[in-house]
Design a protein with these regions (language model features):
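AMP-dependent adenylate-forming
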Residues: 21-47, 561-568
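ANL superfamily adenylate-forming
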Residues: 41, 128-180, 287-337
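Conserved AMP-binding/adenylate-forming core of the ANL superfamily
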Residues: 34-89, 106-111, 163, 203-204
Length: 602
């Protein structure tokens, strides 16, 4: 199958925007809880739609009073917490455009986003974040930024007080300012080269996709459903699901620190969660290690095999009686305990950001947690395709959501069209033009469609590394910084589907003798000996540390290995134009790479 298009389930009027989702929920007699926050006692307290609307409007009035104009850009730099969504919707109620910033970003990264977007203000979480923003503003002498409001300080109170004089009519006019075709947010994404590009996502992208997404996933997103958000809201995946929950009247709680995730799952008891494959890997590995430590390793492995076999049989449409009996037994011995660790009520999980793999998909389905894997990019407001409870094929990323279309180009590239696709790249009509072919967005990924319209991802056209936690990393930025030192010949950053970033480094055989002499080391030291010498290792570590200052913590190189033989054209690791053949390096040095990840503490 070359292409598939799925018609919309929900038609949305053109003069609608994201604020209408909140207003609609607040007008319902049921007044559903849209968010839950931890009170002083540690108990979860619901925030109803009417209460959320009131809080959002109070902050929006403050933004208007502070001089934020329709269409102005306002940044948000914070961990995943209630105030993130409060600020996001307040920006929309004021007719402005929100610009997410990862809270781990360096001042240089923040400076680029603030200056490129022309942000007039920024919401930040803490004094630490405020310092980064102020350093960024000073770094590039950014004059547009007039305000910084801190969640942990009195930023929101300042806005509420400032907004007392803003009348209802002004707010109402601002709220109605944007239609479906207007920009709601600019999300900066890691390009293959150069600076991050700002993806312009419209109110239509969010509203049409969330309305149709909720209609396609009624078992998951509905009034009374509860989820706990722990992925960064700066990432389009978590952000979109947050808006989808408002559209569906589901309740969202937040865990800013993943260390608290397990206790929070147990106290909040979500009905569905949103995660990246790394989370499912951790749940599986922790359960296995716990079983092995308790002398029950055999039970775990047997139970895992039964879960996978049961899921495969269930998907094929027939479960043999013997397997049913074994499955029921392990449900009591093992599966129930894993579900209880996740709060006991989780029935569905939505997975994206990186491939899950069908083994984990079948394992979780087999223990009673249906993992719905989807696929998308920042440029497609997250999901182009997703598996749904009614239409699921484990090992694929599902069929297109209603309103979306997928085509496979002649070279295998996945092309996308529909309500999910961005307007373009901010200030970059040249890049926008390159990103589309005949009206179809070029994803840069390679895949195939089966006869039922389910998409499978088979490879990446681009070189961007996606870690197991879904973080996009541009290898060239780090590699170039490390290669800048004469002692280094080549550097290959590793980390695709891995828990962290590492690097393979080779030494420059011509530069080595001079370096040895300067450091009073024996001239006869071979490259292989130098690769293990403490002085050389210390020098490379210093280079790595310096390179790491240009990126966020999640993108930083945690471990490196010096490889004794250089990567050259003769060894088959360089092209004639001296470009690294990554796949060949990873293949030839797979044992080194495996040793990095098997010995390192995650």
């Amino acid at each position: 199958v070359r292409d598939i298009s799925v018609p919309v389930l929900v038609d949305v009027p053109r003069q609608t925007n994201t604020t209408d989702l909140v207003v609609r929920q607040a007008a319902k007699p049921s007044n559903p809880a849209l968010f839950a926050v931890k009170g002083a006692s540690g108990d979860w307290e619901n925030i109803s739609a009417t209460e959320f609307r009131r809080q959002v409007e109070d902050v929006a009035k403050g933004l208007i009073a502070s001089g934020v104009q329709p269409g102005d850009r306002v940044a948000i730099m914070a961990r995943t917490r209630y105030e993130w969504s409060l600020a996001d919707f307040a920006i929309w109620f004021a007719g402005a455009v929100s610009v997410p910033v990862y809270e781990t970003s360096s001042p240089a990264q923040v400076a680029w986003i603030l200056s490129d977007s022309g942000a007039v203000g920024a919401f930040v979480e803490s004094a630490r974040h405020e310092n980064v923003v102020r350093e960024a503003v000073a770094l590039e002498d950014i004059e547009s930024v007039q305000h910084v409001w801190q969640f942990d300080g009195d930023g929101l109170d300042t806005l509420r007080t400032a907004g007392v004089g803003t009348d209802e009519q002004t707010l109402s006019d601002r709220r109605a300012y944007a239609g479906l075709d207007d920009i709601a947010t600019i999300i900066y994404t890691s390009g293959t080269t150069g600076k991050p590009k700002g993806c312009e996502l419209t109110h239509g992208n969010f509203v049409e996709l969330s309305e149709n997404g909720a209609a396609a996933l009624p078992e998951v997103a509905h009034e009374g459903a509860q989820t706990i958000m722990f992925l960064p809201l700066a990432h389009v995946f978590a952000r979109f699901i947050s808006v989808l929950c408002v559209a569906a009247g589901a309740t969202v709680a937040h865990t800013p620190d993943v260390k608290n995730l397990l206790p929070d799952l147990q106290s909040y008891k979500p009905t569905f969660i949103l995660a990246v494959p790394r989370v499912f890997e951790k749940v599986y590995n922790n359960s296995m290690l716990k079983a092995e430590d308790g002398g029950k390793g055999k039970i775990f492995h047997a139970g895992a095999d039964v879960a996978i076999a049961w899921s495969k049989a269930e998907q094929a449409g027939k479960i043999p009686l013997g397997l049913k009996v074994k499955h029921a037994l392990f449900d009591r011995l093992l599966y129930g305990k894993i579900r209880t660790a996740m709060g006991g009520r989780v029935q569905h999980a939505v997975s994206g950001g990186a491939p899950l793999g069908d083994r984990l998909g079948h394992f979780f389905h087999g223990i009673g947690l249906m993992v719905l894997e989807g696929y998308g990019l920042t440029e497609t407001t997250a999901p182009i395709t997703v598996n749904t409870p009614k239409r699921i094929k484990i090992g694929t990323v599902g069929a297109p959501l209603p309103g979306n279309a997928v085509r496979i180009a002649d070279d295998g590239e996945i092309l996308a069209k529909g309500v999910c696709v961005m307007k373009g790249y901010f200030n970059r009509p040249d890049l926008t033009e390159e990103a589309f072919v005949d009206g179809w967005f070029r994803t840069g990924d390679i895949g195939e469609l089966d006869e039922d319209g389910f998409l499978s991802i088979t490879g990446r056209k681009k070189e961007i590394i996606v870690t197991a936690s879904g973080k996009n990393v541009i290898p060239a930025l780090l590699e170039d910084a490390i290669r800048a030192n004469a002692l280094v010949s080549q550097c290959v950053v590793v980390g695709d589907q891995r828990p962290f970033i590492s690097a393979l480094v080779t030494l420059d055989e011509e530069a080595l003798p001079g370096w040895l002499e300067r450091h009073h080391l024996p001239a006869a030291t071979t490259t292989a000996e130098a690769a293990e010498h403490p002085a050389v290792l210390a020098e490379i570590q210093e280079l790595v540390d310096t390179a790491n200052t240009t990126v966020s913590r999640a993108e930083a190189i945690k471990v490196f290995r010096i490889v004794p033989t250089d990567f050259t054209e003769a060894t088959g690791h360089l092209t004639p134009s001296m470009k690294i053949k990554r796949a060949q390096v990873l293949k030839d040095y797979s044992d080194v790479v495996e040793s990095i990840y098997s010995t390192a503490k995650v």
